[in-house]
Amino acid sequence: AEGVRYAVVPCKDSQGYIYYQSSVAAAQTNISATTFDAAAVGALKEAGITPVASICAFRDPQAPYVDRTMAVRYQDTEYFWLDAAADAGGKPWLNPYSQGAANYITALIDEARAMGFEQIWLTGVQFPTIAGRDKANFGDTGGLSMGQRLAQLLEGWQAGGDCWVE
């Protein structure tokens, strides 16, 4: 490991899979068959390597099925908004305006820190940017623009320690 200073370890990916034994209720059905634990994080530290947890925030096609209140909706329906047609493999996303979705990501960040991760690398901290977004319903925005909402979330996540955003 000579010359290696950081190791990025996937904790949650853009497919919604969790790579450790999370205690967060919304994560229970999405835990990967391959996981790591706090001992693995400790081994990195003992080797002089800073562990960095990689967590994909709102691009998550699985968690909406666990808690529908966390999802972006299609127009004024209870259906999920999908990032493509269903027959073309379209997937739902978590809604950044949803307090449930925000709490879910916050809980995963807190768990990563509790496992010993010193830094968090966040990906997918965004609203969907693809065609068809005009049909997306984000619900109550609290009067915040999309940019303001993401900034608000990041401020909270960064208050607990180093968070980097891709």
Language model regions located:
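Catalytic domains of carbohydrate-active enzymes, especially glycoside hydrolases
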Residues: 2-17, 111-123
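Glycine-rich, proline-tolerant flexible connector loops at the mouths of alpha/beta enzymes
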Residues: 11-31, 124-144
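Substrate-binding cleft and catalytic face of glycoside hydrolase catalytic domains
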Residues: 14, 43-67
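Aromatic-lined carbohydrate-recognition surfaces of secreted/lumenal glycan-active proteins
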Residues: 50-60, 120-125, 142-166
